[in-house]
UniProtKB/Swiss-Prot annotation:
InterPro entries: Male_ac_gland_sc (IPR004315). This is Accessory gland-specific peptide 26Aa. It comes from Drosophila mauritiana (Fruit fly). Residues 79-100, 172-191, 230-250 are annotated as: Disordered. Residues 1-18 form the signal peptide. The gene is Acp26Aa. The lineage of its organism: Eukaryota, Metazoa, Ecdysozoa, Arthropoda, Hexapoda. Its main location: secreted.
């Protein structure tokens, strides 16, 4: 953009210089034309006297009459054929200022056309660069939107991944808890019972055996007492009280 502004300023400077040169050349051409038009022959007194002497109208005229003078000398020198030939010779030998002005004007027009063409090219280049910059800005905005959408999608995927990790850890914890629970199924014959169940069976058997022994001893004592009551003569003192009884025989 800075180069484009610099080129536009340079072109504006060229236009102002060309306009100033054109105005200066026009002023010089006007001065030259006015100088050429003022190129008249000076008055000659001797030739004027000869004209009066030879003229019949002037001879027949009375004194005191106002005679109109033919201002031959006031005519421009270009009207005479001799002067025209001289002017042609001079124009062929010396460069005419009008021709130089025309040449300068032609060169100025060529330079002006070249500058206009250069200006049009710069404007087209500027327009192309502007359109290219606009397209680049649009592409940048589109890329920004794509990046924002990709980031949002990445965030969503990260959240889903975190939720899946959490669910997986919960499932692992539940599986670990299930594996630590005791089995409620009945033990098979091949598998030995646990220690607690064995101790319980042993205790039950010992108490049952003790209960059975006590019952048998009680039954034997009752039978012995009944027999002693029925046969008192056969009672022989042994130094023991009848309540002690005989030792049990199993």
């Amino acid at each position: 953009m800075n180069q484009i502004l610099l080129c536009s300023q340079i072109l504006l400077l060229f236009f102002t210089v060309a306009n100033c040169d054109g105005e200066h050349q026009l002023d010089s051409s006007v001065d030259l034309k006015s100088a050429v038009l003022k190129n008249v022959a000076p008055k000659n007194v001797a030739t004027q006297a000869e004209i009066v002497k030879d003229d019949v109208a002037l001879k027949s005229g009375k004194k005191g009459d106002y005679v109109m003078d033919i201002e031959v000398s006031d005519m421009p020198l270009d009207d005479y054929p001799i002067n025209n030939s001289k002017s042609r010779k001079n124009s062929s030998t010396l460069p005419s200022p009008i021709l130089t002005d025309k040449l300068n004007q032609g060169s100025n027009q060529i330079a002006l056309k070249a500058l206009k063409h250069r200006l049009v090219m710069e404007q087209n280049n500027n327009l192309f660069l502007r359109n290219h910059s606009v397209s680049l800005m649009n592409e940048i905005e589109a890329r920004k939107t794509d990046i924002i959408q990709a980031r949002q999608l990445n965030i969503d995927l990260e959240l889903e991944l975190e939720s899946l990790k959490r669910k997986l850890s919960e499932m692992n914890v539940q599986n670990a808890r299930k594996s630590t629970k005791s089995c409620k199924k009945r033990p098979s014959k091949d598998i030995a019972p646990p220690v607690n169940q064995l101790q319980e069976v042993i205790v039950k058997n010992t108490y049952r055996n003790k209960y059975l022994t006590l019952l048998t001893q009680l039954a034997q004592k009752i039978n012995y007492e009944i027999a002693n009551v029925n046969n008192p003569a056969t009672d022989v003192p042994t130094g023991k009280s009848p309540s002690e009884g005989n030792p049990s025989t199993t």
